[in-house]
Amino acid sequence: IRLPADTPEGLRPHVQVMSTVPDLLSFLKKFEWMIAVLADPAACRRIARENVEDAKAEGIDYLELRFSPYFMATAHRIDVAKVVEAVVEGVAEGSRATGVRVKLIGILSRTFGADACMKELEALLTHRTHLVALDLAGDEKNYPAEMFINHFKRGRDAGWAVTVHAGEAGGAPSVWSALQQLGATRIGHCVRALDDPKLMDYLAAHCIGIEANLTSNVQTNTVPSLAAHPLRQFLDRGLLATINTDDPSISGIELRHELEIAAPAAGLSPAHIRQAQRNALEIAFLAPEEKLALVEKIR
């Protein structure tokens, strides 16, 4: 692979966001070089394992990793089902070696269209027992939730939970669609929910989890600054909002950065941050006994 630079510092601007980009699609272009190095299933397995090892180094005890096998397969035309198998194996290796508990979430990359996403779903279903949830990510504006209703029905029928990227590049109606058409119990980003009081009421009444991503939302120009992020308002309203990293390698962050630097800059007090962490445990895709075991481990 011919890289655009021959030093880590020279390569960094091509694979990380160095400053705010115009929009989400500009942010997503940073993935191109990362996907380029996934030349075969062995590379996919290694990356999956190293993600778990990185989490251990960060002091993380429980990790939910999400991946789009179709996207990972595109650069070198790898069999999509083999990508799923490789990720499952790599995560299992990493978990055994580190003791980090990991759950996998399959992503349908909406930007490739409904037909490609159906192929992606079929590949994910070959390892249905190793996944806990199905996600929809990518170009929210041009590929709305209604295109993927059948995909998510099949996912729910397989026993998976549903989390959907919505309310980031799209408005509050995109969040409504994720909830009502796809059956989401968690929403990634959900920034635009603040524009719709009825939606805010619904999120509270139905205990919908919100996966907030502070640094990422500033970098993608979803919000103009950390201070303008609605996370504090979500928490003050009693919503099940949490603090996440989104794409940590592209954003150049770790969870500690979000908790210790980004969250205070967004107006969160230590009490807000503790509540967000309690919310994270509540909405985690874990069985009650698994949550209890995790609490006992970190006491």
Residue ranges and their predicted role:
Residues 1-160, 169-174, 181-186, 192-209, ...:
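Metal-cofactor-binding active-site regions of metalloenzymes
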Residues 165:
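Short HxH-centered metal-ligating active-site micro-motif
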